[in-house]
Amino acid sequence: MAETIEVPAGGYRYIPGVFQYSAGVRALDGYRIERAEFARPVRLADGFAFIERYLQQQGIPLAGFCACELRSPAAFTDAGFVAFNRHYVGTLERWGVMRDDKNPVARSNVCPELHKPAEPSFHAFCFTRPVPGASGSFVIAGSGEAEEGHAAYRDRTVRFGDTSPAGLREKGIYVLNRMEQRMAAVDATWADTTATQVYTAYDLHPFLGDEIVRRGAAQHGLTWHFARPPVVGLDYEMDCRSVPVEHRVA
């Protein structure tokens, strides 16, 4: 099980991941994670500017920014994904949230099949707020059906290129197991979640009941986004969270 690292200034601890995002975050005792979803996608630069103003108006330090959900117009090549991520983390470095390639912020980044944004954009973000007696809220970062942190995703992808029912089932099982491993690292299970999201352009019904619902991953329903993971060749992604307060922002 992965060891978590505390971010006292942000009021949370995180599961170390790759330089572009952590594998998940959990609020420290006395803090609550809240989620804010944009009414429509907001391009990256404008989204970061909005988040900075929003947190300042709420009296929350930038260190409290702990997770986000992005939308991109199309899947990246491996090299393109690295270049995008270097651009993305630049703001986190400027904010002092990320140092020495250690990124505490959880993230998902997916590509809608329809109604695509013109450029990479924010869909939602999460932050911590001091609340006496609060505990237990968490966000698990998105994961596709490949081992992360390698130069070529293709070489570490489950059933690469196989979108048959059997192939998708195996991809789905891999990702569900990854979600459970990450939740275990923050002392949580499916029973603690308030929302589960899946991102795929393929039919998940053949394993929806047997694999997703049966293990408790859809106790509050399942939000299915008709979208693809952010790297060419990946077909299935999930994330989940336990967030007691959610907002809609302009």
Regions flagged by a language model, labelled:
Residues 1-250:
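Short, polar/acidic, helix-capping and beta-turn segments at strand->helix junctions
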